[in-house]
């Protein structure tokens, strides 16, 4: 299970290197699934707005509210949401491979 980012299809401004790395990891996920299948499944989880450290993230409260307003579930996720997605792909998804699972409260479905 690789951890990518919800912005792999719509990169954020000023995050060029990060975006390149995460997009590459997404392609690696698909390539490895093709190379290692059928014996090994390879998937990725793409976190969206996950609970940020309150004072250390560089985002002001207005930006945080904007992000939440663009999320269908109207909240940020928690690290446990990512862990549960990884667990699902490992233990309960034997017929899923080469997939990137967005764990973003529906934000990737909304427009930025």
Task: Describe the function of each predicted region.
Residues 75-103, 108:
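C-terminal substrate-recognition "lid" of short-chain dehydrogenase/reductases
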Residues 41-51, 102-104:
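Conserved SDR Rossmann-fold cofactor-binding beta-strand/turn motif
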Residues 33-38:
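Alpha-helical segment proximal to the catalytic Tyr-Lys
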């Amino acid at each position: 299970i690789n951890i990518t980012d919800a912005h792999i299809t719509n990169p954020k401004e000023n995050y060029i290197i990060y975006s390149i790395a995460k997009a590459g990891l997404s392609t690696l996920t698909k390539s490895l699934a093709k190379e290692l299948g059928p014996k090994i499944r390879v998937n990725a989880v793409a976190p969206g707005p996950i609970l940020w450290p309150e004072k250390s993230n560089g985002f002001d409260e207005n930006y945080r509210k904007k992000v939440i307003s663009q999320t269908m579930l109207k909240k940020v996720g928690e690290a446990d949401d990512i862990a549960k997605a990884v667990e699902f792909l490992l233990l309960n998804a034997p017929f899923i491979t080469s997939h990137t699972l967005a764990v973003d409260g529906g934000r990737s479905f909304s427009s930025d």
